[in-house]
Amino acid sequence: GWQAGITGYYDEKSYCKFGLRGTENGTLAELTVRSPEGKTVVRSAPAACGTLRMEADGLTRRFYLDDTMFAELPRAEFLADEGRGCQKRFTGSMMGLYAVGADFTAKFGELSMENYTPDWAL
């Protein structure tokens, strides 16, 4: 089936995917985490198509379907190597959009970034 959504990505072993996917029984909203410890579906629920949003606040990631919080990852350390000793090549994560499959339309619209000053810089 089809899939479309948002991903927080560090590498092929460290990412989260929040999206909608078509199944034989309808549409599901789903948050999946892949970390060095393995792959986990954090939450999966029937949903109508809607607007997806991911907010990042330090290590916390919040995921919204329309204006309702779908799930929260309070400590998403798997998206960075700081303090983990993972021997990765750089520190930093990316955010991306994905759409795969047929017979659907994915519209990617707004990216909003606000000024952020980490606590250590104050």
Per-region residue spans from a language model:
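Extracellular glycan-recognition regions
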Residues: 1-122
